[in-house]
């Protein structure tokens, strides 16, 4: 259900502009493209928390609320929900600002999901989070 009367939750971790090459056959931005932006944004926060490499291990309940158009500004907001021994659970929201299509200036939440990342060592094996690295 769309997030009405709500402001973005978390820190802005990624901001980009949609392009025509990111569209599906209907002319809307691909859901997969939006999901990849969320993954990149979430990984940025997870890497900061882990103090090093992380991998995405799970995406829970991604919900797309509204279509995204060419020329829209896409902002990914993230906040850490919890940490485990090596895992970092992050809530991600995608907020859109319409600057090319109508209604101009509209700001809304287009998608939300929970991403889980795991801190890994140089061999790609899970490693414990350092106590000082946990936010």
From Swiss-Prot:
It comes from the Bacteria. SUPFAM superfamilies: Thioesterase/thiol ester dehydrase-isomerase. Pfam families: 4HBT. GO terms for molecular function: long-chain fatty acyl-CoA hydrolase activity. GO terms for biological process: acyl-CoA metabolic process; fatty acid catabolic process. It is an enzyme of class 3 (hydrolase). GO terms for cellular component: cytosol. InterPro entries: Cytosol_ACT, HOTDOG_ACOT, HotDog_dom_sf, Thioestr_dom. Residues 8-123 form the HotDog ACOT-type domain. Its EC number is 3.1.2.-. Keywords: Hydrolase. CDD domains: BFIT_BACH. Belongs to the acyl coenzyme A hydrolase family. NCBIfam families: PRK10694.1. PANTHER family: ACYL COENZYME A THIOESTER HYDROLASE, ACYL-COA THIOESTER HYDROLASE YCIA. This is Uncharacterized acyl-CoA thioester hydrolase BUsg_263. It comes from Buchnera aphidicola subsp. Schizaphis graminum (strain Sg).
């Amino acid at each position: 259900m769309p997030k009405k009367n709500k402001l973005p939750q978390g820190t802005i971790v990624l901001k980009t502009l949609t392009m025509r090459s990111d569209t599906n056959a209907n002319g809307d931005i691909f859901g997969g493209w939006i999901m990849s932006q969320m993954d990149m944004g979430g990984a940025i926060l997870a890497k900061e928390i882990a103090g090093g490499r992380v991998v995405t291990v799970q995406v829970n309940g991604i919900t797309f609320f509204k279509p995204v158009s060419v020329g829209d500004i896409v902002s990914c907001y993230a906040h850490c929900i919890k940490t485990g021994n090596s895992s970092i659970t992050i809530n991600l929201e995608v907020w859109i600002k319409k600057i090319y299509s109508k209604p101009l200036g509209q700001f809304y939440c287009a998608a939300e999901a929970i991403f889980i990342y795991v801190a890994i060592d140089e061999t790609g094996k899970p490693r414990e989070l350092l106590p000082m690295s946990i936010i």
